Amino acid sequence: MAVAARAAAVACLLVVGLAAVAGVDGATASSPAPAPAVDCTAEALKLADCLDYVTPGKTAPSRPSKLCCGEVKGALKDSAAVGCLCAAFTSKTLPLPINITRALHLPAACGADASAFSKCLAPAPSPSVAPGTSSGSGGAAAAPAKGAAAARSPMASTTAVLVVAAAVAAPLLAFFHF
């Protein structure tokens, strides 16, 4: 029972620390972003029960738990929450090992809409070529991005990645170090 209490304490400390960092980063962003329709921190933490399923390794279960599936189905009801989770799952800066294929297929594994995270798999534009700098046929502008991710600042994506990292790290730290 003491291990569970320590795990909860570690998770709470990580969430509070990340919330403080996210608040400071959001306040110092150079361009104002509209208020998010959903709290990405809360959405990422709701999927903590999916950790054992998305963690790489031979000990990962073949199916996500019922708790995990309930959380996934709840998140899928809000397109902004799906946008937050897509940004977190597909981030190249995620510091912890996560089986991205399993993470993106959580809805299908839980019996929900298999295409829910399909937009996550769309290739991102190449960062080496800025929009409008193509030497193509006379200045065709790039089409603006659609959906919740278009309105989000880069800081929001970074915050989402940090939150998912904390949600993954807290149970692992509690399990292996306490």
Curated annotation (Swiss-Prot):
SUPFAM superfamilies: Bifunctional inhibitor/lipid-transfer protein/seed storage 2S albumin
UniProt topology in membrane: Lipid-anchor; GPI-anchor
Record: glycosylation sites: N99
GO terms of molecular function: lipid binding; peptidase activity
Keywords: Disulfide bond, Glycoprotein, GPI-anchor, Hydrolase, Hydroxylation, Lipid-binding, Lipoprotein, Membrane, Protease, Proteoglycan, Signal, Vacuole
PANTHER family for this protein: BIFUNCTIONAL INHIBITOR/LIPID-TRANSFER PROTEIN/SEED STORAGE 2S ALBUMIN SUPERFAMILY PROTEIN-RELATED
Protein name (database record): Non-specific lipid transfer protein-like 1
Lineage: Eukaryota, Viridiplantae, Streptophyta, Embryophyta, Tracheophyta
